Amino acid sequence: MRTLLVLCALVLAGCAGVPPTPVAPADLGLPRRVHITLQSPGEVRQDALLVVQAEGAHATRWSLFDPLGMPQARQILQDGQWRNDGFMRPNGQASDMFSAILFAWTPVSALPSAYPGDDWRDTATPDGGRERVMNELCGPRWRVTWRRGAPADTFTITTGGGATWRVEPLKDTP
């Protein structure tokens, strides 16, 4: 019985592990500014602004703000590891969301080198859109969908837990 409990704990730990990050960099066209609509089951929809910029040769800075401009998360991805930037408290949900957006932004041609192995797939959907899935031991971690005819930088990410993150570029207005 004890062995079974330990085995179950290990399986569950694998399902809630550190989000995957690319092992090889891809050209992301930085800096980027996007609007994110976050919706978790049973919670009120939230809007956020994400700014991503290069930080030296091998790092990117990810800054998430609420609609009033208050920082919600600031993290740096360097050598495949997330770390906090400044005095913000750790935010695991932000790391997961940032990793999912990075997965979506990675060009199809760069996926095999950035995410080696067979944990992901990128396919056309029957309605003419596109879908990209990152799997983990317990099923899909993220499902990225692009509607038919939608720009490549406008997509929706659905997590294994049912949360959705709608990502679209900020409109440049004078």
Question: Which functions belong to the PLM regions below?
Answer:
Residues 20-29:
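Short, low-complexity, disordered segments immediately C-terminal to signal peptides
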Residues 16-20, 36-43, 49-51, 70, ...:
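Mature, soluble, non-transmembrane domains
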Residues 11-14:
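C-terminal motif of bacterial Sec signal peptides marking the signal peptidase cleavage site
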Residues 78-81:
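Acidic/histidine-rich, surface-exposed loop or edge segments in extracytoplasmic proteins
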Residues 1-7:
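Sec-dependent signal peptide recognition
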Residues 56-59:
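Glycine/acidic-rich beta-strand-loop module
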Residues 30-36:
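Short amphipathic
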